[in-house]
Amino acid sequence: QCQETMEKLWVAIAERYRDCVTVAAYDIMNEPQNNGGYEGENSYDPWNSESWHMSNQIYDRMIKAIREVDRDHIITVEGIWRISNLPDPEKAGWDNMMYQLHLYDGDDMFRKLAAGLAETAQRYNVAAYVGEFQNMHGLGICNEYGISWTTWTYKGANQDVADFFC
């Protein structure tokens, strides 16, 4: 039932904005494999292939529904912290896609993951986007790899994520 409601919502959004040139992309789900620390009865391991498969099934359903009414807008899907959990869009039948990560890592891991995102984007012929980050060197690293980016917040530029909540 939740997926049905979600699909109806995305179809309504796509119908409303399909001709709107100021809408850059549709971001289907924010951090779909993130339990947010929840470890209760219905939690799952965000690092295993089963959770990736579940997310990709939902992505597939939403992308197909959106494409029924809007063939033009970019659709972005998030691998969140790792890009390897997203499928080859051509094999999935997806087009006009942007693959996205959210990176809250230190410089070395940020660089490694950004390099992987850039390589995946080139291999799959998709746009690359870091939709959230707080690393003070992240902007430069994204630019180095030709990755589009948005910082998580404009409140600060310190390494400690706690500084962003001030």
Can you name each region flagged by the protein language model?
Residues 4-25, 29-152, 156, 161-166:
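Extracellular glycoside hydrolase catalytic/binding regions
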